[in-house]
UniProtKB/Swiss-Prot annotation:
Tissue distribution of the protein: Expressed by the venom gland.
Disulfide bonds: C54-C146, C56-C72, C71-C127, C78-C120, C88-C113, C106-C118
Cross-referenced InterPro entries: PLipase_A2, PLipase_A2_Asp_AS, PLipase_A2_dom, PLipase_A2_dom_sf, PLipase_A2_His_AS
CDD domains associated with the record: PLA2c (cd00125)
Signal sequence, start to end: 1-19
Protein name: Basic phospholipase A2 beta-bungarotoxin A4 chain
Source species of the chain: Bungarus candidus
């Protein structure tokens, strides 16, 4: 084998070994982020929705503080129903969808885990696009506001 080829092959193997220790983002999270980016105003990033209100982000408690937070509350409950009623794993479930003409189309047979999770994400992303983003509700003190 040519020494140059051996060097390239070694570099590829080393990089693959390093990449094996990097946990992948669940495919569904990537899909959901893409849906959000498609529906929200251009000046916002999907990350600005990750720690908003009482329900946007990890966990959730109390009453939603506004319409946007209610979108996250409904999304959390939708995922909960997908897990308990349909035995789906929403965070890792793959699904097919299309972004077109300012809407989102979910594919797959009704009642399948892929379709159920896609519908949860679609509904939330469209809700985000229709709801006002209130800056003071970002990074709120959840112990104080979300009881």
């Amino acid at each position: 084998m040519n020494p140059a080829h051996l060097l390239v092959l070694s570099a590829v193997c080393v990089s693959l070994l390093g990449a094996a220790n990097i946990p992948p983002h669940p495919l569904n999270l990537k899909n959901f982020m893409e849906m959000i980016r498609y529906t929200i105003p251009c000046e916002k990033t999907w990350g600005e929705y990750a720690d908003y209100g009482c329900y946007c982000g990890a966990g959730g408690s109390g009453r939603p503080i506004d319409a946007l937070d209610r979108c996250c509350y409904v999304h959390d409950n939708c995922y909960g129903d997908a897990e308990t009623k349909h035995k789906c794993n929403p965070k890792t479930q793959s699904y097919s969808y299309k972004l077109t003409k300012r809407t989102i189309i979910c594919y797959g047979a009704a009642g399948t885990c892929g379709r159920i999770v896609c519908d949860c994400d679609r509904t939330a992303a469209l809700c985000f696009g229709d709801s006002e983003y209130i800056e003071r509700h970002k990074n709120i003190d959840t112990k104080r506001h979300c009881q």
